[in-house]
């Protein structure tokens, strides 16, 4: 039997590496946890709580941007109340849909559903890359984002409520299809993830607070620390690479993963 701390390290690393890549961290966590025989209510709460580590990695990396939302900077548009307004618009659609259909969404946390989401997301990614060839990528910096674009990305983010689809994939695709450069779509995807993930994680943790025990602290803290470190490195590397590569390699990886998992459970 694998120790709880070992499970925390493995799942923390998996979550941190996959959270901000367009491959679905939730899908990977469900699959890996299943093979580790880490299931049940404790596993479900852990999969939510460990996201806090990944969220904090984004906050640290983009600290100046978040501070700019509190202390407006001159000559920058994505700052102060306007920047908060853009993030609110992006958060609004998935926030409403997620709240209204929270119970139903929880029923989709199954291996077959994740396989379907991985496959569907891959197809969408390949199609979006093809469509973007004919779309002018005119939005280069965060300061060029408009409320219309921010809201549009929010509607795309609703796709990520299907476990296995990938929030990162949905928002990056949405940004690109709405005219943002690939690297900008990725950066905004990371920043916009913070309010959504804080809200979703906080809601789930409060709802399941009675499932926590003092004995769970080492597992959860270990997972969050590993997720933070893995996410920090992954974001740094991904931002350097995303302007040079397309979403296609990630789409093919998702298809391969879905096929392998299908064979394993067949």
UniProtKB/Swiss-Prot annotation:
InterPro entries assigned to the protein according to its UniProt record, in alphabetical order: UppP
Catalytic activity: di-trans,octa-cis-undecaprenyl diphosphate + H2O = di-trans,octa-cis-undecaprenyl phosphate + phosphate + H(+)
GO cellular component, one term: plasma membrane
Chief location of this protein within or outside the cell: membrane
Enzyme Commission code(s) on record: 3.6.1.27
Further comment: Bacitracin is thought to be involved in the inhibition of peptidoglycan synthesis by sequestering undecaprenyl diphosphate, thereby reducing the pool of lipid carrier available.
Cross-referenced NCBIfam families: PRK00281.1-4, undec_PP_bacA
Classification via HAMAP family: Undec_diphosphatase
This protein's name: Undecaprenyl-diphosphatase
Organism: Lawsonia intracellularis (strain PHE/MN1-00)
Gene giving rise to this polypeptide: uppP
């Amino acid at each position: 039997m694998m120790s709880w701390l070992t499970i925390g390290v493995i799942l923390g690393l998996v979550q941190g590496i996959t959270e901000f890549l367009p491959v679905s961290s939730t899908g990977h966590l469900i699959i890996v946890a299943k093979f580790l025989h880490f299931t049940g209510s404790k596993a479900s709460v852990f999969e939510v709580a460990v996201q806090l580590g990944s969220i904090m990695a984004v906050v640290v990396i983009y600290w100046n941007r978040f501070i700019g939302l509190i202390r407006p900077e001159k000559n920058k548009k994505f700052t102060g109340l306007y920047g908060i307004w853009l993030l609110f618009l992006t958060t609004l659609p998935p926030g409403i849909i997620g709240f209204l259909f929270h119970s139903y969404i929880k029923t989709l946390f199954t291996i077959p559903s994740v396989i379907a989401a991985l496959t569907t997301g891959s197809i969408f990614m390949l199609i979006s890359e093809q469509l973007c060839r004919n779309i002018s990528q005119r939005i280069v910096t965060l300061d060029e984002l408009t409320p219309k674009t921010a809201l549009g990305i929010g509607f795309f983010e609703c796709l990520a409520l299907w476990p296995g689809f990938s929030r990162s994939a949905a928002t990056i695709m949405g940004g690109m299809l709405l005219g943002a450069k690939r690297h900008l779509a990725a950066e905004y995807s990371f920043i916009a993830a913070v309010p959504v993930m804080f809200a979703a994680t906080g809601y789930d943790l409060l709802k399941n607070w009675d499932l926590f025990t003092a004995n769970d602290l080492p597992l959860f803290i270990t997972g969050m620390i590993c997720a933070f470190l893995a996410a920090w490195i992954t974001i740094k590397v991904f931002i350097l690479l995303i302007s040079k590569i397309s979403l296609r390699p990630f789409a093919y990886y998702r298809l391969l993963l879905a096929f392998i998992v299908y064979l394993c459970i067949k």
